[in-house]
Amino acid sequence: MENRDSVASLLLLLLLLPPPHTHQGQVLRHVVPTQNSQDSPARYLSNGPGQEPVAVMTIDLTQMSKPYSSFEFRTLDPEGVIFYGDTNTKDDWFMLGLRDGQLEIQMHNPWAQLTVGFGPRLNDGRWHQVELKMSGDSLQLWVDGKELLCLRQISGTLANNSWPSMRIALGGLLLPTSSLRFPLVPALDGCLRRDTWLGHQVHLSPSAPNLGNCDVDLQPGLFFPQGTHAEFSLQDIPQPRTDPWSFSLELGLKLVDGSGCLLALGTRTNSSWLSLHLQDQKVVLSSGVEPKLVLALDMGLPLQLKLDILKVVLSQGPKTEVLGASASRLAALRTLWSHPQGLLSLGALAGDNSSASFCLSDLWVQGQRLDIDQALNRSQNIWTHSCPHSPNNVSHISH
């Protein structure tokens, strides 16, 4: 390897070599390099909302042995960070990620400042092989055996003859998202496996944390494992119609298991002014002391909740139930949208002993799709773009 090969141009090749390190006080996944051919377990790339990586390593570049790396990854998520690397966050960093399902490289160093999106959409839930190779001052990238990218003249002469150290972050960033050349949502609901980095295979230790959805057959969707939740401010989502007043939402339920809260409208101090609970493959609508409604669920049909000044309606396909709420209760519900702490909650409520888990194909509010990335807060274990493929998988998933 010539000394003209810049640090930044090697960032695609170097990842997760030992020893383990910590980032922002958290203990990150421990990895062990080996030389054998046995496959290591797939790694889940998401560490929840935000930009926190799942692992951070500091690498001595004098220890690299081969200018070649490869890995396989799969995702249904169209956007997020696969990995980031730097020698310093100000003027020498690199990012490989996805945007609109396509690979994207962002690079900032003294010799090259660029953003390149390329190749086919890879967020199809299938495993894709990525290979990376340095040749002189050029970087070549293959996907599934086809060369998709060659970057030239992205290196320069180093200030000294020794390689500096480098930080590598998997599934996240070590600089503010706003410092990217073209900001994106860092969290990526995806997995990586069969990775070889400069001649080393990296294996998780037996004490490594949960592997997310990497050992489950997937389908597109939004999955709430048992005990997880998300909250949206009512002021940040599409607003009710005003003349006459009405509000509607629609949930595309694919899978449900267990019992517990599905959805609630309320505040911080009273989270369930109106709620939908899952119970034995049925949904129960309740509002305070008013009589409850029970509707048997039919998977595949959208579940609709509509409120107006006269009634609350729950429907699915041809089935419709009307909640016999009082005029004063309906008037109180309407005040939620002017309450500074008005919330739409999905999943388990605080203090709720919920065993429910469920998969949504879509969530629509006032005819507009609601993005989980817009949540005020959410559990880190929510799968933002994938669900178990079979109902048999749901009850066996633990986070």
Swiss-Prot record:
GO terms of molecular function: steroid binding
Signal peptide: 1-29
Record localization: Secreted
A cellular-component GO term for this protein: extracellular region
Organism for this UniProt entry: Phodopus sungorus
PANTHER family: LAMININ G-LIKE DOMAIN-CONTAINING PROTEIN, SEX HORMONE-BINDING GLOBULIN
Superkingdom of the organism of origin: Eukaryota
This protein's name: Sex hormone-binding globulin
InterPro entries reported in the protein's UniProt record: ConA-like_dom_sf (IPR013320), GAS-SHBG-PROS (IPR051145), Laminin_G (IPR001791)
Protein function: Functions as an androgen transport protein, but may also be involved in receptor mediated processes. Each dimer binds one molecule of steroid. Specific for 5-alpha-dihydrotestosterone, testosterone, and 17-beta-estradiol. Regulates the plasma metabolic clearance rate of steroid hormones by controlling their plasma concentration.
Quaternary data: Homodimer.
Keyword Disulfide bond set for record: yes
